[in-house]
Amino acid sequence: MKALVFHSPEKATFEQRDVPTPRPGEALVHIAYNSICGSDLSLYRGVWHGFGYPVVPGHEWSGTVVEINGANGHDQSLVGKNVVGDLTCACGNCAACGRGTPVLCENLQELGFTKDGACAEYMTIPVDNLRPLPDALSLRSACQVEPLAVALNAVSIAGVAPGDRVAVMGAGGIGLMLMQVARHLGGEVTVVSEPVAERRAVAGQLGATELCSAEPGQLAELVARRPELTPDVVLEASGYPAALQEAIEVVRPGGRIGLIGYRVEETGPMSPQHIAVKALTLRGSLGPGGRFDDAVELLAKGDDIAVEPLLSHEFGLADYATALDLALSRTNGNVRSFFNLRD
């Protein structure tokens, strides 16, 4: 099979590999589509956490089950079905798993980071991680189920409620999902902050009231000039410390900040006294948080969540270098580079 493999920072190869054999309780999936996430780019650059080289990246995917190893009693009902699946492979036995937080598993394995992921024609995955797709949801659109689940989890943790004014910082693939989920839940996205003009334009098309660049102080200046834009909730998706500091400054007293993006290579000064003085609530979220079923259902409805503006540039897997370069440069209107593995 064809596979993209990351071997070391900024060293990737397009290889022929044997089709993997599913272990008991695992399925073999024929991958259809996989999109490139910001975390994949950090992994490529070697500035991520909890991973090991060499690894096949990819965790935003869709595909078709071709085989199930039923030695542990799993039935074969998913064979031939189109599916998506959770990257989180938890042990089920540690204290974190016992608390119902498998994403914090002490023995966590993640597809595309510590286990080979979906940038290959075939991938193995625990059967319990799979979610079948309804006929109404195409494989192309379904590769965005995982980022939608991430957004649903994050917006829920941040407590967005009907009537809330919401600011979103960062309008990449996750940021654009966050703003759509916030609107779906009845929030008003008053402002989106994003450095790339084409991504700002997409945010405007998807319903943001106002747009601003992400230069330091721009969002604070806009909110000071237009107090009606002051957010009840800020969803910070860029991962930059300066952005978090600005979120603390612009959110209303008693407001809430959801931390979704993070960059392990970035550090910066903070003024945390404002958290206490303004009585703010900060909540971090990590991964899809068990929201795959909700994401599949919402995306299949086809009315509240638009994925086509996110799927901006399609590539065959052999063109991985161009796909990665475009995603890293964020030029030519790139929101998401994605691979069609059946073309």
Swiss-Prot record:
Question: Which pathway, per its entry?
Answer: Metabolic intermediate biosynthesis; 2-deoxystreptamine biosynthesis; 2-deoxystreptamine from D-glucose 6-phosphate: step 3/4; Antibiotic biosynthesis; kanamycin biosynthesis
Q: According to its UniProt record, which cofactors does this protein need? A: Zn(2+)
- InterPro entries found in the cross-reference section: ADH-like_C (IPR013149), ADH-like_N (IPR013154), GroES-like_sf (IPR011032), NAD(P)-bd_dom_sf (IPR036291), PKS_ER (IPR020843), Zn_alcohol_dh (IPR050129)
The lineage's top-level taxon is Bacteria
On cofactor binding, the record's note says: Binds 2 Zn(2+) ions per subunit.
Question: Which residues are involved in binding Zn(2+) 1?
Answer: C37, H59, E146
Keywords assigned by UniProt?
Answer: Antibiotic biosynthesis, Metal-binding, NAD, NADP, Oxidoreductase, Zinc
Gene3D superfamilies xrefs? Medium-chain alcohol dehydrogenases, catalytic domain, NAD(P)-binding Rossmann-like Domain
Keyword NAD in the entry? The reply is: yes
| Disulphide bridges, residue numbers | none
Q: What EC number(s) has UniProt assigned to this enzyme?
A: 1.1.1.329
Q: Where are the transmembrane segments?
A: none
Q: Which residues bind Zn(2+) 2?
A: C91, C94, C97, C105
Which GO terms of type biological process are on file?
antibiotic biosynthetic process
NADP among the record's keywords? Answer: yes
Q: Which reaction(s) does its UniProt entry say it catalyses?
A: 2-deoxy-scyllo-inosamine + NADP(+) = 3-amino-2,3-dideoxy-scyllo-inosose + NADPH + H(+); 2-deoxy-scyllo-inosamine + NAD(+) = 3-amino-2,3-dideoxy-scyllo-inosose + NADH + H(+)
Q: Which GO molecular function, any one, fits this protein according to its record?
A: metal ion binding
Q: Which family does it belong to?
A: Belongs to the zinc-containing alcohol dehydrogenase family. DOIA dehydrogenase subfamily.
Entry function: Catalyzes the oxidation of 2-deoxy-scyllo-inosamine (DOIA) with NAD(+) or NADP(+), forming 3-amino-2,3-dideoxy-scyllo-inosose (amino-DOI).
Protein name as it appears in the record: 2-deoxy-scyllo-inosamine dehydrogenase
Which gene underlies this protein? Answer: kanE
